[in-house]
Design a protein with these regions (language model features):
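C-terminal alpha-helix plus adjacent terminal tail
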Residues: 2-131
Length: 131
């Protein structure tokens, strides 16, 4: 393999399957914009796609969902340095949230996979630290 160099990969590579996300591209573009509250509202009207997103986020921390939506919104107008700084400051804030410790407990400590997260917070607390 070493003698063949990168061309050895051609003989070993498998054809790529179609992306599982590709079929949802239009719905992703339509649904995932704005605040988490806006996204949730659009999920209700998104049929099978909305049901799948709800299934995949059922055990997610409400604060993480709200914060992620705010981060994406803020970073849409930032350059790379500003986006990375937003990631840093939001990460610092999130690691101090009770939901972070609860998620660690549920997944890594007790391994019961049954977190008891706080109710969905206001997005303002995250907007205050983002550029």
């Amino acid at each position: 393999l070493i003698d063949e160099g990168v061309t050895a990969l051609d003989a070993l590579a498998l054809p790529a399957d179609e992306s599982g996300l590709a079929r949802w591209y239009e719905q992703i573009e339509e649904v995932f914009a704005g605040s988490w509250a806006e996204i949730e509202g659009r999920l209700d009207a998104a049929g099978e796609f909305g049901a799948k997103v709800r299934e995949l986020t059922a055990q997610a921390s409400p604060s993480a969902l709200v914060a992620a939506a705010e981060l994406f919104h803020a970073n849409a107008t930032q350059d790379l340095a500003g986006s990375l700084d937003n990631e840093r400051v939001l990460g610092e804030l999130m690691r101090g949230e009770p939901d972070f410790a609860e998620g660690v407990r549920a997944v890594l400590v007790d391994k019961d996979q049954a977190p008891s997260f706080a109710p969905q917070p206001s997005p303002e607390k995250y907007r205050e630290v983002l550029k």
